[in-house]
Amino acid sequence: MKGGSHMITRADKEQEIKLITEKFGKAKGAFIVDFKGIKVEQVTNLRKKLNAADSEMKVVRNTLAKRAFKDHPAIETAFANSMKGTNAIVFSYGEVNATAKALADFAKDVEVLQIKSGVMDGAALDDAKIKFLATLPGKDQLRAMLLGTLLGAGSALARCLNAYAEKMGGGAAAGTEEAPQA
């Protein structure tokens, strides 16, 4: 290896393809992003945000990624037109909308990051779907909203029952007091 070039052996390529294939198998969703022009410290910051969203970003060679897609036809179809240029795959192992939100928020601050395409549950995600997905609340937030609604409805019911009981109790007491006077 003269001149500092980095040659990848066939075994290295096969190992990389196997690794990407395994990551797709574990992921609930994935995104292709173009990170050309992003500074190293920005990439580090993005990786931290993605880790917080139970996701990871892997810089891949397009040819190796395409070979890894062969085991995942839905992903191959979804990413068919995205594998040009400087790409990374973002694997989402948790809530896919949290990953989409992390990417969308980062892309607002660092405009050179392009979210090219995504896939979730075997369905392709275009730009509009990814932006919509990023606006959805996560499972924990939805659970909190549901719990708040249930508790609110329960306390409203309790207040109604108490008011009804007081009214009935107050009306009966007034009726019994008036009866002896008349």
From Swiss-Prot:
Keywords: Ribonucleoprotein, Ribosomal protein, RNA-binding, rRNA-binding. One of its GO terms (biological process) is translation. Gene3D superfamilies: 3.30.70.1730. GO terms for cellular component: ribonucleoprotein complex; ribosome. CDD domains: Ribosomal_L10 (cd05797). The keyword RNA-binding applies. InterPro entries: Ribosomal_uL10, Ribosomal_uL10-like_sf, Ribosomal_uL10_bac, Ribosomal_uL10_bac_type. SUPFAM superfamilies: Ribosomal protein L10-like. One of its GO terms (molecular function) is large ribosomal subunit rRNA binding. Part of the ribosomal stalk of the 50S ribosomal subunit. The N-terminus interacts with L11 and the large rRNA to form the base of the stalk. The C-terminus forms an elongated spine to which L12 dimers bind in a sequential fashion forming a multimeric L10(L12)X complex. Belongs to the universal ribosomal protein uL10 family. Forms part of the ribosomal stalk, playing a central role in the interaction of the ribosome with GTP-bound translation factors. This is Large ribosomal subunit protein uL10. It comes from Bdellovibrio bacteriovorus (strain ATCC 15356 / DSM 50701 / NCIMB 9529 / HD100). The gene is rplJ.
